[in-house]
Amino acid sequence: MLSGLIKKYNLNNISANYISSQRSAIRLYRNKVVEIIFSEENIDSFDDFLPFADTLKEITFYKCNLSDLSELKRLEQLRDLTLECCSFPHMDVFDNFPNFPALKTLEITKNKNITNLNISSNSIKILNISDTSITNLANVNIPSLKELRTTNNYIKFIDKSFPKLENLYVDFKDFDFYSLKSTPNLRNLHGYNADTNQKLEGLENCKKLKYLDLYNSPFTNFLPFKKLKSLEFLDVQENKIESLKGLEHLPHLKKLYMFYNPIKEISDITPIKNLQVIAIEKHKILKIIDDLNLLGIKYIVLGEG
């Protein structure tokens, strides 16, 4: 069993908890196989892994050629499955993806040939389908999902109900924020690849949204966020913020991170007097440091360069 796997994949480095080669490894716990991490391997069958089905908890395949996934469904104790940058001669596995009763995390990423995912699961909490060509979530039936990552693909709306979803990573360009009505418990939103004419209409319907971060957005002030009354943490680092205009409309905002923006300085404490923490280059707040100290507002200046 294990000896055959060692020989087939040239796993010649043996220690107390790992059997490995330069690119792949098997992790042991109490002499039982619990994790497989394979990189750039040709895996013609999952039959080699079936003897460990009762103990195998985690699998990571990176840049592997996976010829036959039909036996994957027999790994019923699997909790974490990562298929990153892998090739699949038979793509039909994604038309009816196996249901693992114990699976908590599923990552299928960095393969633009994947256009569909048909899956049903009551156990998965985290799903990452970034860098694929999946266009919709109509066939993703995961009612207990708490985190969804969909960056660098073609998903422009949430067309499935995810009542427990709390964390979402999504491309903002052309995204329909009104579709987030399907995620009533969304608390953390991470936005990437914003458009030059980016709008946030519809996002105000996410009444429980507490955390928002944006990367490379076109916004020069805080007016686009003015309807997001529930926000407590806003991260706009490395954006185009030139002024604090609009910040007064965010009454519950506690933390503001804004390193590396073109804003030259803050000379008036009024817009941020309700904050608990501001992260900004020190030279931009020199005029108000005494006021910040008086109000007990912490300032983080690690971004000073």
Located regions from the model:
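Acidic, low-complexity, intrinsically disordered interaction modules
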Residues: 21, 25-40, 52
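Periodic aromatic/glycine/histidine/acidic cluster detector
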Residues: 26, 200-201
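Surface-exposed cap/linker segments adjacent to membranes
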Residues: 1-19
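Extended Gly/Ser/Thr-rich low-complexity repeat segments
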Residues: 46-55
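A short acidic, amphipathic alpha-helical/loop segment
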Residues: 48-49, 71, 93-96, 179, ...
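Tandem-repeat architecture and repeat-register "anchor" residues
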Residues: 72, 117-120, 140, 158-161, ...
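Concave beta-strand-loop units of leucine-rich repeat
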Residues: 16-18, 35-44, 58-67, 77-90, ...
